[in-house]
Amino acid sequence: MTGGKSGGKASGSKSSQSRSSKAGLAFPVGRVHRLLRKGNYAQRVGAGAPVYLAAVLEYLAAEILELAGNAARDNKKTRIIPRHLQLAIRNDEELNKLLGHVTIAQGGVMPYIHQNLLPKKTPKTGKNPSQEL
């Protein structure tokens, strides 16, 4: 054998592949499986459950980061800060419903001015009615 330990697998066998790479995910399937087992959510955890949960978590993270990146770009910034996360989540109807009771540290508040506090719009007719003869 070349450069390996003696014994073990044959030199022609392929290397091990993680469950995350098999599923095409960036989130760790093995870690999610371990956390599901240690969390006492159920006595047994199926093989597909951590893959599905990791895929859902990866999708949610990608969705939030995309919207936060757009908010950062709108503010002419290159780095996402908690304020951008807050703006992204609160401006999206579904994410706001999902994370409605979540407080984001250093997120600030949503800008809102009540209609009664805005200046009144005056109709522009071109001529003042009192000056007409």
Swiss-Prot record:
Family: Belongs to the histone H2A family.
Alphabetically ordered keywords of this record: Acetylation, Chromosome, DNA damage, DNA repair, DNA-binding, Methylation, Nucleosome core, Nucleus, Phosphoprotein
Domain notes: The [ST]-Q motif constitutes a recognition sequence for kinases from the PI3/PI4-kinase family.
Coiled coil start-end: none
General remark: In contrast to vertebrates and insects, its C-terminus is not monoubiquitinated.
Motif [ST]-Q motif, residue numbers: 130-131
Chain positions found as Phosphoserine: S130
Gene3D superfamilies per UniProt: Histone, subunit A (1.10.20.10)
Site (Not ubiquitinated) location in chain: K120
InterPro entries hit by this protein: Histone-fold, Histone_H2A, Histone_H2A/H2B/H3, Histone_H2A_C, Histone_H2A_CS
Protein's UniProt name: Histone H2A
The UniProt record lists the keyword Nucleus: yes
PANTHER family recorded: HISTONE H2A (PTHR23430)
Modified residues (N6-acetyllysine): K5, K9
Methyltransferase recorded as keyword: no
Gly residues: bias regions: 1-10
Low complexity bias (residue ranges): 11-24
Stretch list, region Disordered: 1-25
GO CC term, one of those recorded: nucleus
Pfam families to which the protein is assigned, alphabetical: Histone, Histone_H2A_C
GO biological process, one term: DNA repair
PROSITE patterns given in the database record: HISTONE_H2A
UniProt GO molecular function: DNA binding; protein heterodimerization activity; structural constituent of chromatin
Location(s), subcellular: Nucleus; Chromosome
